[in-house]
A protein has these predicted regions:
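A short, Lys/Arg-enriched amphipathic alpha-helix followed by its capping loop at the start of a domain
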Residues: 2-12, 31-44
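Short hydrophobic/aromatic-rich motifs at helix boundaries and adjacent loops
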Residues: 4-8, 25-28, 45, 65-70
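Asp-based phosphoryl-transfer active-site loop
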Residues: 8-25
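Residue-level preference for alpha-helix termini and adjacent loops
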Residues: 19-20, 27, 62, 87, ...
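Short, solvent-exposed loop/turn segments at secondary-structure boundaries
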Residues: 24-27, 81-83
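Active-site phosphate-binding/coordination module
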Residues: 33-129
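Short, intrinsically disordered, charge-balanced linker/junction segments flanking boundaries
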Residues: 128-139
């Protein structure tokens, strides 16, 4: 990258799990917090991109993201509006549940405001813990 090209940056995208959040420590690092603050102070739009649903997007004290790409960009929004929504077709959801059942893994199904799982294992519990949440296991 050219030395002068940094001033041309208008938006920065960040994944949550493994990028913003250290997966071993389950927290955002102080260095990342400072980096995000520096970008924001320089007028760069901060975008969080994640596979998580909107209600599982973690918040980070002192950091104000502008745009959120949730559910792997199938649901995109700002604080004021939904920009894009493209839910997974029901037939595909059924196939995912069946395939997961065959390998004895729980599945969490979710919408914009919440969801539930057909069971829970350590991987799923750890994933929810990053957003300071618990798996909602349905009967």
């Amino acid at each position: 990258m050219k030395k002068d090209s940094a001033k041309d940056i208008k938006i920065a995208f960040f994944d949550v799990d493994g990028t913003l959040v250290d997966m071993k420590k389950k927290v955002i690092t102080p260095a990342m917090v400072e980096t995000l603050k520096h970008l924001k102070e320089n007028g760069i739009i901060l975008c969080m991109a994640t596979g998580r649903g909107p209600y599982l997007v973690p918040s980070f004290p002192g950091i104000d993201f502008d745009v959120f790409l949730s559910y792997n960009a199938s649901y995109c929004y700002t604080k004021d509006e939904v920009i894009f929504s493209n839910p997974i077709p029901k037939e595909d959801v059924k196939a995912i549940v069946e395939n997961a059942s065959e390998i004895h893994r729980p599945v969490f199904l979710a919408g914009v405001e919440g969801g539930g799982a057909n069971g829970c294992d350590k991987d799923l519990a750890d994933y929810f813990a990053i957003a300071k949440s618990k798996v909602n296991v349905l009967d």
